[in-house]
Amino acid sequence: MKNYLLCAVLLFLAISCSTESDYEHSQNVDSKEIALRTSSQIPKNKTNPFDARGKEYLDLLTIYLKNNKVPNSINELTDRTQFLLKNYGEARFLSKINATFTAKQAALLMGFEKPLTDLIESCNVTPEVKHYLINFFQALLAQEGQEYDKLYNYIVSFETGILRSNTLKDDEKETILTVSSISTYALYIDPKHKDRDWEISVANRKVQPVFNSHRASIISVLAVVRTLF
């Protein structure tokens, strides 16, 4: 009888250890897969020497979204842009942390095309850089509603053209590539450009807001960019 009990106990322990080991292995595999899948989704262009500046912008957006939602109103857009102006500017250009962005400015930029162009024209950059940036942002605005992959491919193609340019100076290339990198990461976090799987997963939730988050993302970028140059 004692032998039977001993065998039963040993068998139970063996099964328990095996199950625990399999569970731990499964957990480790799942974690690795999730980490790999997440990292592969982060946009990056290794050929852009200023790509890290866009990643800094994404890191700030991620921090902001921990306690706030994606803007769905002029006031929320204003708050997010002010946060980015203060923190991105503070990290890079201490002399410009007093830059402000008002709800009135946000409303004008959301409603009309000319203020967007005027904002670029007011940047302290060369006419050549302004020309490239105006065309760049107009192209992005025209692609509202596109999935992120298409936006990303457009930006990478644009950056390739800038890098190969024989007419732009090095500092002009730096300015343009910094702006394009920030735009890459800003649009990545915009829920409007999530893939079809994401759309299906939220199909039973409330209808998406009419607030143009694509345009709002570009406006935040422009407001920050204006303080950098």
Language model region names:
Residues M1-L5, S18-T19:
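Positively charged n-region of N-terminal signal peptides that target proteins for export
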Residues Y4-A8, R215:
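Alpha-helical transmembrane segments
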Residues V9-L10, F137, L222:
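Enrichment for repetitive, rod-forming helical segments
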Residues L13-S16:
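C-terminal motif of bacterial Sec signal peptides marking the signal peptidase cleavage site
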Residues T19-E199:
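Acidic/polar, low-complexity intrinsically disordered N-terminal segments immediately downstream
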Residues D190-F229:
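Hydrophobic, gly/ala-rich membrane-insertion helices/peptides used by toxins and envelope proteins
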